Amino acid sequence: MWRCRASPGAQSAPLLGFIAVRDRYDQAQCLQAGRIWQRAHLLATARGLAARPSNEAVEMVDHERALARPPSRAALLDRLTGDPSCQPTFVFYMGYPKHAAPASPRRPVEAVLLR
């Protein structure tokens, strides 16, 4: 199962979440799911939480579809929502980090403002 291959840090995360859409192959819905993830990730970081994507399960849905196999992974994922019209399209882990991540380099705000 895909969860067994997750990194040790992810396995200890107390939250496994997902973002679901009505049609995981609709471009507008996928873009909106990405925006939701960006906002949730920024909010989590601001509150001292760590979050990381874990889309192996969703990628397996695409893999089965590309190979014209029965949608067994899609059926498993769809059961997570309890609503057959909601399809998980983005999976993530979230929790409090054991170690602080190094800060990513940032330019000063003045360097990126348009005037």
Label each PLM-derived region with a short phrase.
Residues 1-115:
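Acidic, surface-exposed loops and disordered segments
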